[in-house]
UniProtKB/Swiss-Prot annotation:
CDD domains: EFh. Keywords: Motor protein, Muscle protein, Myosin, Repeat. Residues 36-50 have a biased composition (Low complexity). This is Myosin light chain 6B.
């Protein structure tokens, strides 16, 4: 009879080896994903490193800086000249920017959830963050317009017909009058009535 009892003793051995193996690989990342809602952003962190704020050049004028400081002080609920990381996105939007949450996290240095709720930033540190977001918006606008105009670039040579561009400017989006269109297109058409739309866009966005 004792030999027959040896067989069941081996049964736990099989699953005891396979179970830890199955848990060990996904265990750590899965636990983090459940514990921290920000974990799904981890891949983005590796692809988009934090912005180097020391290289950001402040381009705001004096009036803008005064307006920004006043708004910053309204968000300072403690009165120590600082606001929480978690308030930065809302303040940026209140100041006319429209950054995504990912963009806000990027300029903040990709902080963890706990840091968003505990770390604070003063106005001088916040300013280059706001500037970085503003420049990123301008670049995004350029890329969006460029992509839209490529639809009319039938030859793929970086040019569109002036007539088509006139039609777009007077009928789509924030419609322009014919006089306004002629003003912005002045000097951009070549002898064939075509316009280099990349140069045209850079000119328009610099106005």
């Amino acid at each position: 009879m004792p030999p027959k009892k040896d067989a069941p003793v081996k049964k736990p051995a099989g699953p005891s080896i396979s179970k830890p193996a199955a848990k060990s690989t996904p265990g750590t990342p899965l636990a983090k994903a459940k514990a921290e809602p920000a974990a799904p952003q981890a891949p983005a962190k590796s692809q988009e490193p934090p912005v180097d704020l020391s290289k950001v050049v402040i381009e705001f004028n004096k009036d803008q800086l005064e307006e920004f400081r006043e708004a910053f002080e309204l968000f300072d609920r403690v009165g120590d000249g600082k606001i929480l990381y978690s308030q930065c996105g809302d303040l940026m939007r209140a100041l006319g920017q429209n950054p995504t949450n990912a963009e806000v996290l990027k300029v903040l240095g990709n902080p963890k959830n706990e840091e968003l709720k505990s770390r604070r930033v003063d106005f001088e540190t916040f300013l280059p963050m706001l500037q970085a977001v503003a420049k990123n918006r301008d670049q995004g606008t350029y890329e969006d317009y460029l992509e839209g105009l490529r639809v009319f670039d039938k030859e793929g040579n970086g040019k569109v017909m002036g007539a088509e561009l006139r039609h777009v400017l007077t009928t789509l989006g924030e419609k322009m009058t014919e006089e306004e269109v002629e003003t912005v297109l002045a000097g951009h058409e070549d002898s064939n009535g075509c316009i280099n739309y990349e140069a045209f866009l850079k000119h328009i966005l610099s106005l």
